Design a protein with these regions (language model features):
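Conserved small/polar residues in nucleotide/adenosyl-binding loops
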Residues: 144-149
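Feature captures the catalytic cores and cofactor-binding loops of soluble hydro-lyases/lyases
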Residues: 4, 8-9, 13-140
Length: 155
């Protein structure tokens, strides 16, 4: 189910987009990954624990999720940032869509983000603490006073 969402970085820069997956706040260190394939492996890689992953490849979700390619039993990342999110996967190995996997694993995703611009910010200024959240559940003001402040987003 799609919903309005926002990405807010610790430096105050924000991006509005379309949310997918589980509707909750996802707070973590925003990083980027330049891989063209393997989003399932990246999401479940324990080395991404506590991080929000920005995929620089623009189209994510097209091969769905299978039960063989996980690096661990659960999604390690706190969130996912993409340019284009594929609603309907097409792959003979696919057992479920990426969105269904995100909901099952209670992970939020935001799409329709200018990931090239975001990646330049991260490259030039270094990783930033950020939060992805459904705009109907939080405002920026509430976000600064919530648990996200404990993660470094407070003013």
């Amino acid at each position: 189910m799609k919903f309005a969402a926002k990405l807010l970085l610790e430096n105050g820069i924000s991006f509005e987009g379309i949310g997918f997956g589980f509707q909750k706040i996802g707070v973590g260190e925003v990083v980027f990954n330049t891989a063209i394939t393997g989003y399932q492996e990246i999401l479940t890689d324990p080395s991404y624990d506590g991080q929000i992953i920005t995929f620089t490849y623009p189209h994510i979700g097209n091969t769905g999720i299978n039960f063989e390619d996980n690096e661990s039993k659960k999604i390690a990342a706190r969130g996912l940032i993409v340019k284009n999110f594929c609603d309907f996967p097409s792959n003979y190995r696919s057992k479920m869509s990426l969105e269904d996997f995100l909901v099952e694993q209670k992970t939020i995703c935001i799409s329709d983000i200018d990931t090239r611009h975001l990646t330049r910010i991260l490259r030039d200024e270094g990783c930033k603490i950020g939060a992805i959240y459904p705009t109907k559940l939080f405002t920026d003001c509430l976000l600064y006073t919530s648990d996200a402040a404990d993660e470094g987003l407070g003013v």
